[in-house]
Every structure is written in structure tokens, then in C-alpha cells.
């Protein structure tokens, strides 16, 4: 934005790649493999509340509404292979 005129100088917005923690990536991979939260909790020796908190954070960081959208977006960004 030009300070004097208030006009936008560039119309292109560059989106930064979302940053997931190692644990969030691990959980997203397990979700992609079809594991439920309670199964992920057991497998990783976490409480289900911790797993669900990670799931919530993943959705927020990727700005999506559900796990399928999160998986697709993470694959598109190269976060998951």
C-alpha cells in the first residue's frame, strides 16, 4: 500500500506455507491412513484430548474445516508426501 495515496501497489498475494509441528504431521499421516483419534492416542501413548487438540491445531493452521481438506492441502503444500 502506498503511504501517500493509500492505493494497493501489487495485487498478488504470496501465501506462506503452513508450518506443522513434527507431532502434527505424524498425526495427520495417521489420520490419512484411516486411524481414529482414540486409535492415534493409543498408538502414540497420548490422551485422546491431546490428539483432538492437535487435530484442531492442524485444521486452524491449514485454514480448513475437516480432515480430508487438511490432508489435501498438506499434500498440495508438500507437507505430506
Please name every model-derived segment.
Residues 73-81:
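Intrinsically disordered, low-complexity basic tails/linkers immediately adjacent to helix-turn-helix/homeobox/MYB/SANT
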Residues 36-69:
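Recognition helix of helix-turn-helix DNA-binding domains
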Residues 1, 33, 64, 76-77:
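Charged, alpha-helical scaffolding/interaction elements associated with membrane systems
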Residues 25-32, 59, 71:
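Hydrophobic residues on short alpha-helical segments
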Residues 6-30:
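Regulatory hinge/linker segments at domain boundaries
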Residues 1-5, 9, 43:
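C-terminal output helix
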Amino acid at each position: 500500500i502506498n503511504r501517500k495515496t493509500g492505493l494497493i501497489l501489487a495485487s498478488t498475494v504470496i501465501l506462506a506455507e503452513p508450518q506443522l509441528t513434527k507431532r502434527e504431521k505424524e498425526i495427520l499421516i495417521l489420520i490419512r491412513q484411516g486411524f481414529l483419534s482414540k486409535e492415534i492416542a493409543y498408538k502414540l501413548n497420548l490422551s485422546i484430548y491431546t490428539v483432538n487438540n492437535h487435530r484442531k491445531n492442524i485444521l486452524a493452521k491449514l485454514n480448513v474445516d475437516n480432515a480430508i481438506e487438511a490432508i489435501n492441502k498438506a499434500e498440495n503444500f508438500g507437507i505430506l508426501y
